[in-house]
Amino acid sequence: MHIWVDADACPNVIKDILYRASDRLKLPLTLVANQALRVHRSAYIRTVVVPRGFDVADEEIVRHIVAGDLVITADIPLAAAVLEKNSHALSPRGERYSPETIHERLRIRDMMEQLRDSGVRTGGPAALSQADRQAFANALDQLLVRA
């Protein structure tokens, strides 16, 4: 299993959890971003910097993943594309996206986008809590045990 991270919006605390898991299990971890990142030095961790632009990092990830890989992302359309390639998708809050739930998540995302486009303020996600960090670590462990 290769772990890929949609790194531009991924919280640092989640990246730290991923660095430790990558080193502990000797799994390749690739962070894809449109800017240079400071990452933990490890033989298993690398970064890929892509040009700025809409979905450029997402497309880079989808182009390289293979069945069974894991992608960390809060981006619902990217998660849907990952699932189509028989890979795993996990949010930084520990939500595991699945073929059964992704279509509903896409509908909700599209509805919220329409509301924002019509001028309704929908607010953003809450700050990442300790419970979110623990949920992520637990979900990651469950996925990696299966690998």
UniProtKB/Swiss-Prot annotation:
It comes from the Bacteria. Pfam families: DUF188. Belongs to the UPF0178 family. NCBIfam families: PRK00124.1. PANTHER family: UPF0178 PROTEIN YAII. This is UPF0178 protein AFE_3267. It comes from Acidithiobacillus ferrooxidans (strain ATCC 23270 / DSM 14882 / CIP 104768 / NCIMB 8455) (Ferrobacillus ferrooxidans (strain ATCC 23270)).
